Amino acid sequence: MGGAISKKRSKPPRDLRQRLLRARGENYGRLFKGVEDGSSQSLGGLDKGLSSLSCEGQKYNQGEYMNTPWRNPAEERKKLPYRKQNIDDIDEEDDDLVGIPVEARVPLRTMSYKLAIDMSHFIKEKGGLEGIYYSARRHRILDIYLEKEEGIIPDWQIHSGPGIRYLKMFGWLWKLIPVNVSDEAQEDEEHYLVHPAQTSQWDDPWGEVLAWKFDPTLAYTYEAYIRYPEEFGSKSGLSEKEVKRRLAARGLLEMADRKETS
């Protein structure tokens, strides 16, 4: 299912995995006891160019649900100046920007079920996200990569939470799993305060350290919807009162209120 799209491509993708790993740290394979070593090495000869761009954390907005259909490419083009400003927010010593297109190579489009599956398999075949720590910075890198290379509007990375995070975009096969940082890693001055294993706790509203994991069953099991229908609002079939009750029970309403007043 995922191999067809990769065979159609005339050139390899930009080096997504390597740029993600350069975003202050490697994957959890080198910091956790009992985890197979060497998983931080890329498996494919990916193209060069994607930079370690600074990221902004995703803000939880009640009513912002899967694939946000009210957004369209024409409106997104109007936001290009703002996005260019975000792209400029990089480390001064980063020299990997040469060759990165400021605008998308292809027409803008929203993420779809089929596209999410194809991109998930394609990324996996070219090295993947497996074992890489999640952070707001890496979230933004992935957004920019798929926007510039595939024209995918960056509104699709909205996860459930806390615990195992499932993307609310049905078809994306990478989930985020909470991981426990070893005492050795916590006390390692080389990684402390700069490694994503430390900083990702600041990016996450629940203070969890997260890492990507491939799960092919997400192609036919809509886990985010099954487990957390209240996060889909009226699309869930639940009453407004029940939606608010469930969101409040999980602390999401209070969290949204704090962000609005901050």
Curated annotation (Swiss-Prot):
The UniProt record lists the keyword Coiled coil: no
Keywords: Host cell membrane, Host membrane, Host-virus interaction, Lipoprotein, Membrane, Myristate, Viral immunoevasion, Virulence
GO cellular component, one term: membrane
Membrane topology term: Lipid-anchor
GO molecular function: GTP binding
Region entry Acidic, spans: 88-96
InterPro entries from the UniProt entry: HIV-1_Nef_core_sf (IPR027481), HIV_Nef (IPR001558)
Function: Seems to play a role in optimizing the host cell environment for viral replication without causing cell death by apoptosis. Enhances virus infectivity and pathogenicity. Probably involved in viral immune evasion mechanisms.
Note, other: This is a macaque isolate.
Record remark: domains: The N-terminal domain is composed of the N-myristoyl glycine and of a cluster of positively charged amino acids. It is required for inner plasma membrane targeting of Nef.
Family: Belongs to the lentivirus primate group Nef protein family.
Protein name: Protein Nef
Organism: Simian immunodeficiency virus (isolate Mm142-83)
Lineage summary: Viruses, Riboviria, Pararnavirae, Artverviricota, Revtraviricetes
